[in-house]
């Protein structure tokens, strides 16, 4: 690990999500080129860009928060960065659903489903801004409820085909296992590889599975 990341308050968490932000940026470029090459319509292109933006937003906010040590930042600034970090989880979940809801689901049902998710995401962001010390389990349950919202529209999602469903399920499982680690604060394999660092790896894995689903089945 480079000296830059070793200076961070949480070196492993910072490094994993800093590289995640870089990967999300280039992944967004790949999705853009894929959409243009495939002649995707504007709805598909816009939905894919929303997904890419949500990835970049989450990983950038997370990397910045986990880099800045408390000795450098005042409590107020660090608290705001923490709020931003946690808030972006809602944005990522809604952003991950957007391509599938807007392109693969029948309309206008897909648009309504997408709108509901974004309304919940906005409510979650506002909740984080004004109730940052909410119980850990409360926000995690809301994350999981949003993440598995596809069960409410299963008939429409099941029509996308088994390969796409497997990628979506794999991503959802990665996020869900990470959420469990976050609630129980386990396992802690070493001083560097704590439950939080493992959570970051699982988020990266979940994002990759969903990126592949967008790349191969939406565009």
Where are each of the predicted segments found?
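Multi-pass alpha-helical transmembrane bundles in non-GPCR membrane proteins
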Residues: 1-219
């Amino acid at each position: 690990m480079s000296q830059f990341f070793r200076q961070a308050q949480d070196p492993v968490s910072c490094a994993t999500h800093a590289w995640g932000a870089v990967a999300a940026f280039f992944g967004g470029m790949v999705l853009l080129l894929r959409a243009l090459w495939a002649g995707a319509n504007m709805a598909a292109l816009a939905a894919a860009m929303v997904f890419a933006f949500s990835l970049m937003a989450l990983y950038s906010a997370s990397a910045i928060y986990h880099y800045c040590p408390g000795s450098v930042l005042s409590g107020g600034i660090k608290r705001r960065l923490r709020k931003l970090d946690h808030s972006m989880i809602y944005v990522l979940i809604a952003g991950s659903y957007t391509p599938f809801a807007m392109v693969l689901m029948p309309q206008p049902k897909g648009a309504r489903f997408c709108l509901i998710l974004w309304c919940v995401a906005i409510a979650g962001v506002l909740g984080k801004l004004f109730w940052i010390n909410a119980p850990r389990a409360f926000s995690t349950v809301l994350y999981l409820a949003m993440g598995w919202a596809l069960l409410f529209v299963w008939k429409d999602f099941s029509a996308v085909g088994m390969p796409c469903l497997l990628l979506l399920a794999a991503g959802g499982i990665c996020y869900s296992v990470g959420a469990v680690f976050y609630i129980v604060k386990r396992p802690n394999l070493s001083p560097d590889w704590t439950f939080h660092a493992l959570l970051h790896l699982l988020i990266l894995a979940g994002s990759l599975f969903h990126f592949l689903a967008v790349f191969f089945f939406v565009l």
